[in-house]
């Protein structure tokens, strides 16, 4: 299998609308965003990688980001330095091609190059997301905590991978 090329996304990207649509199609596991919110997240990101125009997206922040997500803040309270994966999503038609794994591999290289020693994220525990659980476990992530979000309507597992 050929490894797909990744590229970085910035706010001026013409495909932002396609990426936003990809995000919002998967809002049950991510969160629904407006165009303005999505553009702000991309602009604030440590790494915003995409494969093709909108086959896969990984959006992450480092510890200094101006971001008020309760999950991001959970990590900020516990670690001085980290890269937080806010969302990773693959289009339904592109699943099974290794795109998310490729984006994570690119993120790990860039995070190490920037002097980071850990990448963190959260995965839904309730409602469960077994595909994401298995994927992150295969990448070497381990659970470091749990928390309730959205007025206790969701429970998440906080995960960490040392680089």
For the regions a protein language model found, what residue spans apply to each?
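Short amphipathic alpha-helix that is part of the acyltransferase structural core
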Residues: 1-37, 52-55
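C-terminal "cap" of GNAT-fold acetyltransferases
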Residues: 146-163
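Conserved beta-hairpin
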Residues: 44-62
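Conserved acyl-donor/pantetheine-binding loop and adjacent beta-alpha core of acyl/acetyltransferases
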Residues: 59-87, 151
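Conserved acetyl-CoA-binding loop-helix of GNAT-fold acetyltransferases
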Residues: 90, 96-109, 138
């Amino acid at each position: 299998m050929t490894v797909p090329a990744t590229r970085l996304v910035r706010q001026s990207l013409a495909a932002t609308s396609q990426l936003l649509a990809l995000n919002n199609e998967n809002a049950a596991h991510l969160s629904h965003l407006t165009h303005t919110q999505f553009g702000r997240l991309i602009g604030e990101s440590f790494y915003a990688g995409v494969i093709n125009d909108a086959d896969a997206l990984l959006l992450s922040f480092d510890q200094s980001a101006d971001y008020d997500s309760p999950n991001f803040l959970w990590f900020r309270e516990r670690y001085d330095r980290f890269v937080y994966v806010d969302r990773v999503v693959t289009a339904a038609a592109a699943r099974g091609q290794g795109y998310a794994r490729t984006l994570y591999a690119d993120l790990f290289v860039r995070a190490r190059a920037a002097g980071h020693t850990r990448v963190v994220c959260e995965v839904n525990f309730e409602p469960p997301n077994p595909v994401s659980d298995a994927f992150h476990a295969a990448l070497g992530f381990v659970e470091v905590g749990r928390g309730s979000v959205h007025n206790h309507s969701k429970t998440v597992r906080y995960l960490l991978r040392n680089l």
